[in-house]
């Protein structure tokens, strides 16, 4: 077979043969096989050219995708599949990129966790979930998590939460709110509790009284329409307890309020 045309088409070249066959190849393919118009190639050479062209095209696409930011093996694999590249070729491209250090799931996991240590607010459970979604293996995630102590991150988040809620919630509700927020962010309950215990959070009696009377004003308006006497007192006690107020503070406030 003889090459009758080599014509540039955007990022690829159109190669035509005298038997009517056509295929798109990369510039790397032309260089590797020293292709030119009128060159004669065999069936075996054509197959080799086509396979390498697919590999070269896939690798170029992957490198373009990686040029914006680091990506995991799963992300690159999914990106290449959008371009209908043969699965075997995709695996070859991935293997080549891993060999050349363009893809390294271990380094990716370490970088994500390290960035979180410096400025993030996520605990190990949420990080594990996010990294797993990126296709990183459980063993790789666990291996990298062992390198870090999350107590400082938990403390940093706890301090921010304290600033947000202090003076707005009674002591028990403040503790519950901060610990719940920490566990939602991926910290274990024990780590969240330790972080809370390290806080300088003292809700004084005056603040508690101010908060409980403010809440009573709101709840009394709601429940006094339907209830009175003992039933009203019980309803108010229940709703205030759910809000995190101690029963002794509730009883004291109700004696004064009703």
From Swiss-Prot:
Keywords: Cytoplasm. InterPro entries: RecX_HTH_1st (IPR053926), RecX_HTH_2nd (IPR053924), RecX_HTH_3rd (IPR053925), Regulatory_RecX (IPR003783), WH-like_DNA-bd_sf (IPR036388). GO terms for biological process: regulation of DNA repair. The keyword Cytoplasm applies. Transmembrane segments: none annotated. GO terms for cellular component: cytoplasm. Pfam families: RecX_HTH1 (PF21982), RecX_HTH2 (PF02631), RecX_HTH3 (PF21981). Its main location: cytoplasm. It is found in: Cytoplasm. Modulates RecA activity. Belongs to the RecX family. This is Regulatory protein RecX. It comes from Streptococcus pneumoniae (strain Hungary19A-6). The gene is recX.
């Amino acid at each position: 077979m003889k090459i009758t045309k080599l014509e540039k088409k955007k990022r690829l070249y159109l190669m035509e043969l005298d038997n009517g066959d056509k295929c798109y190849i990369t510039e790397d393919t032309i260089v590797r096989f020293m292709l030119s118009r009128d060159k004669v190639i065999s069936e075996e050479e054509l197959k080799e050219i086509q396979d390498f062209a697919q590999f070269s095209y896939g690798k170029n696409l992957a490198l373009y995708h990686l040029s914006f930011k680091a990506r995991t093996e799963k992300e690159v694999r999914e990106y290449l599949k959008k371009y209908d590249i043969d699965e075997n070729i995709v695996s070859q491209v991935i293997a080549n990129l891993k060999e050349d250090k363009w893809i390294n799931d271990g380094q990716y996991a370490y970088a994500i966790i390290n960035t979180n240590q410096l400025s993030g607010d996520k605990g190990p459970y949420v990080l594990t979930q996010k990294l797993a979604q990126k296709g990183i293996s459980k063993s790789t995630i666990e291996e990298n998590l062992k390198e870090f102590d999350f107590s400082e991150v938990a403390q940093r988040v706890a301090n921010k939460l304290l600033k947000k809620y202090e003076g707005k919630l009674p002591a028990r509700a403040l503790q519950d709110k901060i610990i719940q927020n920490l566990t939602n962010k991926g910290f274990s309950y024990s780590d969240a509790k330790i972080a809370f215990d390290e806080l300088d959070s003292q809700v004084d009696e005056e603040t508690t009284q101010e908060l409980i009377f403010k809440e009573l004003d709101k709840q009394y308006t709601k429940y006094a329409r339907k209830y009175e006497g003992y039933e009203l007192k019980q309803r108010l006690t229940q709703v205030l307890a759910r809000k995190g107020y101690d029963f002794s503070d509730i009883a004291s406030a109700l004696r004064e309020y009703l």
